[in-house]
Amino acid sequence: LAHGALFNTAGRAYRVTEEVARAAAEFEKCRSLLTGSEVRSKIAIHYSSTAVINSVNAPLLKNYDYRSTLIDRVHAAFRHYNVDVIETNHALDGYDVLFSPFLSTVDEKGLKERVIEWVKAGGTWVVGPMSDIMTEYSSKYTNAPYSFLEELAGVYTKYELPVANEEYRAKWAGGEGTFAISTCYSAYELKGAEALAVYENGEFAGMPVITQHRVGKGKVILLGTLPEADVLRSFSGSAPILPASDNLVLTARSGSGNAIIAVETENKSGVLVLDGAYKEMLSGRTLEGSVSVAPYEVLVLVKE
C-alpha cells in the first residue's frame, strides 16, 4: 500500500491515529447518551441533486456554485439550530418550516403535490430565490417563470434580474429596518399575497421582494432574492439552541437523556453562553455562563 489512513507503509502510526483513538474513547464515554437520544429537527433545508445538474447544464448566474451557496449562505445561518438537509423525495412530516432556496426543479418526485398539502396542513414554506424555474431536464418553462409557484404564492413576477450587485437593499414593509440582499433579484406584483419586504433602492424601489401568502392553515414565503442570515433565521419562527459565536455548530439531542453538543469547526476560539449549569461529559467539568471554546474543541453538555 502507498497510503494508509492510520498507519504508514512501515506500519508506524500517524498523529491522526492517536486522535482517532481519542475520538473512539470519547464516543464510549457518551455511549448511553447517544444511543438513548436523537436529533429532532423542526426545520428542513432542501438540497437537490437535480438542482446540481441544472446549475451545471444551464447556469443562470455568474460565478455561482449551488452547493457552496447553500452551505455558506443558507445552512450556515442555522448553525445554532437543529436542522435537517433533505432531498426532494424526503417526507415532510414532522417539519414546521421548510426552506427551498435555489431549488430550480420543484415539480419532481411528487414534491409539488406533497408540499402543497403540507402547507395547507400548517407548514411554512420559505421558497426561493430561483426555485421552480426549470424542468428536471434543465429546460425553462414557456408560459411563466415558474411551473406553479406564482399561483401558490399569490404573486405575478414583473421583473427578474439574475445579476448580483452590492447596492440593492430591502426594507420591511410597513416597518423600520433595512437589510442586505444579494445574488439575484425578482420584483413582484401582489395577486393575493402581502409584501413582507420591498426594494429600498434601485430600479425596483418600492416593489415587493419578499412576500407571504396564506394557504390553508400554513403559508408560503417567497424570496425574490437571498437576504442576510438574520432575515433567514427570522422566518424559522424559533430561537437558537443557545447563543454562540458563528464558528460553533450546536446540536440538541433529546430522548431518555438530553444534551447539547457544541463543535468548533474553523480552528479558532469561540464563545458559548449557557443558560444554567452544565456537566461537560468528556472532561467532567461543570460549566456555566459564558464559556470559551478552543479551536476544534467538542463539548458534550448535560444540564445539571
What does each model-identified segment do?
Residues 1-304:
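Carbohydrate-binding surfaces of carbohydrate-active enzymes
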